[in-house]
Structure formats: C-alpha cells, structure tokens
Curated annotation (Swiss-Prot):
Protein name (record): Imidazolonepropionase
Binding site for 4-imidazolone-5-propanoate: R87, Y150, H183, E250, S327
Signal sequence range: none
CC annotations in GO: cytoplasm
C-alpha cells in the first residue's frame, strides 16, 4: 500500500525526457501528463502516470490536487546562503551614483558583509540561513547550492562551511556546499593574489577530509583573479578530488567561459560578458551555463547574459537566484524565471527546464533531483496554477501551494491558498 497518492493533477510536469543535459529543442520540450497521478512510498516515487492508470492503487492518504499543476522540486544551483548582516543602507548611495569603489572605501560593499560574517557566531549564521532557506522552500526550492566566500580568511571560511554542514543536518532542503574562499582579494593581500590563492589551496586537504565542501569556486574577473590564476587554482582543486565552478565573465569578456569549458567545470556562472568563442566552447562541453538575471536586474544594468543565443547555439542553460546580500537579495526563484523569460528571451518551457533538469546537473544532482520519475525521492510541488506558463507569466508572487520533501509535507500555504479561485 502506498503512503500517499496524489490524484486529479491537471498538468503533471515530470521533466522526464532524455537523461543528461538538455540543449536546443530538448530545452524547449516539457513532458506533461494531463490528468496525472503520483504515488509515494517511504519517501520515494513509486508510481507516475494518468489518473486512469492509478485506479485500483491503494494509499493511506489520497490527496485531490483539484486540477492544479504538480512539478518536481526546484533546484537553485547558485546562492551565497550563509552570511552575516545586510546592506540596505547602500541603496540610497547607489541611487545617488556613488561608485562601488567609493562604497568599499567607506567600509561597505562586500567588505561590510565580510566584517558582519566574521563577527557573527556560527549559530547566528545558521539561524539566519534557516530563515532564508524557509523562504526558498516556500518558493518551491527543494535543493540548493550554498557558497562560502564572506571570510577571506581561514577561520571565517571554516565557520561558514561548518554552518552549512549543520544546516544540511537540520533543514529539509538538500544543500550542496561550495568553497568560495577565492571570492575577492583581501586588502592585506593586494598585489599578492597568488599568495592568497595558495593560502586558500592549503585549506583544501582538510576540507576534503571533513567533507565540508563538494565544489570549489573562484571569482574570475578584471581586478580580482585572472583567467590563468583561476585555471591553475581550479585544476589543483580538481587534483584534490573537488568538482569545480567558476564565476565567469560577469562584467568583461575575460575568457572565463572558455576556461570553464577547457578545464571541465561543472558550471560557469553569470556570463553576462561571455564572448562568442566562449559560448561556442560551452556548447561543445558538458559545462552548464548558470545564468543569474536577477543580479543584472538588481544592479540596474542594461545588458543581460545572452541566454537566447546560448540556447540556440547548444549551450545547456540553468537559472539561479544568486541570492546574496549585495547584488541580489532575493530568495524568489519564481521571480528569476519571469526575468529570464522577459530579459533573456527564454520560453516558459526553457525556463522550467533551467530550474529543474539543467540546474540539477550544474551541482551534480542530475541523477536524484529535477525530475518526477519512479525510484527518485518524492520532492514535489503543488502549484496554485493550472498550467506551467502561468507561473513565470504572473510575476512577483509565489504560486506554491504545497511542497513535499522526501514524501513529507515540508511547506503548505494552508487556508491562504486561493484553491477555489478562477484564473
């Protein structure tokens, strides 16, 4: 007997087409079962099909979804989840046209977050991150990547990673940990970036032994770390058994996309300034292009990543919030879906695949997350929507009704749902 049977699902978005990364037309294809049903037993999906095919199945709990849509839990593959403080005091300065470097000189910018993170205890960081994780869950996210990077020293980086490890044990959302010690060059290492990178590399053996990070990341950008420094750093991390990511070409076409493809990074992230050659190399690689349009939007920039071109050229594109206190303070992955549709010229189908299938591969979870398939864990979202296009179309709010994590209800809107409303 099943534990739970979901029936009367108007659109069941299984996302279950070919295995592996989705490109080109596959990104624009959504496997949908009309009038679907899903069976769950011991936290695992044991039945996927039509309501007609589900007749005769017995379950301890039968949930009538009222003709609404069900999808896999969403995957957010790029966040800076664990940090201290906030930076709302900088908004007025930015609106007045104060340059970022001047804000830095006043102790603001990333330095403000670094200082606040250093001052916070591990438990304070954990409790703050739980608040943000709860919000992510309420937007339908069941798997998330979380980076360190607000320490720029060994003690605080360890603290962030240990906070992430505690969150992995205490919160229902699955968390994939990334070490981003090479987020910036500290003032005391100005002009000595290679020495700083060596310091960060020296932390990796113990980090691997304690299993505090699965990925290593670096910020490859003008004035931070060069392409050659980034490649050398990440290749050494790979030699130690880590998978790697790269903050690439966020501002300038520096060659970060090319470097990511060349070294076999799991993902290259941002890519606003990626060159034509970089896009071509990504298309011919297994590196996911994780685009972060919410950051471009919040920074009030005119030029967004060329998502349409990337998909047309054959790049496997994912979307993420880039949740962080400075350049994208939002946990709302649904808002990112809307911005991607409007500013990256992605179709609703491409957007959905970019927050499920491809985003799961960006963090090496393609075999466990992002699809509704028999044998996979029951990470599911019931939406207050009757078709998939409605979610990115009606922007700025959450359309989530209920989230199941490993077959258990982890979030529900409860009586506030407009279940009887007509769209």
């Amino acid at each position: 007997m099943l534990d739970t049977l979901l029936i009367n699902i108007g659109q069941l978005l299984t996302m279950d087409q070919e295995d592996g990364l989705l490109r080109r037309e596959a990104m624009n294809t959504l496997p949908v079962i009309e009038n679907g049903a899903v069976g769950i037993e011991n936290g695992v999906i044991t039945f996927v099909g039509t309501a007609e095919e589900a007749k005769g199945l017995q379950a301890r709990e039968v949930i009538d979804c009222g003709g609404k849509m069900v999808s896999p839990g969403l995957v957010d593959p790029h966040t800076h989840l664990v940090f201290g403080g906030s930076r709302e005091n900088e908004i007025a300065l930015k609106l007045q046209g104060v340059p970022y470097l001047e804000i830095l000189e006043q102790g603001g910018g990333i330095l403000a977050t670094v200082n606040a993170t250093k001052q916070a205890s591990k438990e304070e960081l954990v409790q703050k991150a739980k608040f943000h994780l709860d919000r992510m869950l309420s937007f339908g996210v069941t798997t998330v990547e979380a980076k360190s990077g607000y320490g720029l020293d060994d003690e605080t980086e360890w603290k962030q990673l240990e906070a992430t490890a505690q969150l992995q044990k205490e919160h229902p959302v699955d968390i994939v940990s990334t070490f981003l010690g090479a987020h910036a060059v500290p003032k005391e290492y100005k002009g000595r970036s290679k020495e700083f990178l060596q310091w960060m590399l020296d932390l990796l053996p113990e980090m691997k032994e304690k299993q505090l990070a699965e990925f290593v990341d670096i910020f490859c950008e003008t004035g931070v770390f060069s392409v050659e420094e980034s490649k050398e750093f990440l290749l050494k991390a790979k030699e130690l058994g880590f998978d790697v990511k790269i903050h690439a070409d966020e501002i300038d076409p520096l060659g970060g996309a090319e470097a990511a493809a060349e070294i076999g990074a799991a993902s290259a992230d941002h890519l606003v300034g990626a060159s034509d050659k970089g896009i071509e190399m990504l298309a011919n690689s297994n590196t996911v292009a994780t685009l972060l349009p919410g950051t471009t939007f919040y920074l009030n920039k005119e030029s967004f990543a060329r998502g349409r071109k990337m998909i047309d050229e054959g790049v496997a594109v994912a979307l993420a919030t880039d949740f962080n206190p400075g350049s994208c303070p939002t946990e709302n992955i649904q808002l990112i879906m809307s911005i991607a549709m409007l500013k990256l010229k992605m179709t609703p189908e491409e957007v959905w695949n970019a927050v499920t299938v491809n985003s799961s591969y960006a963090i090496n979870r393609g075999d466990v997350a992002g699809k509704i398939r028999v044998g996979r864990k029951a990470d599911l979202v019931l939406w207050d929507a009757y078709n998939y296009a409605y979610v990115p179309y009606h922007y700025g709010v959450s359309h989530v009704n209920t989230v199941w994590k490993n077959g258990n209800i982890a979030y529900t809107r409860g009586e506030q749902s407009w279940s009887t409303a007509t769209i």
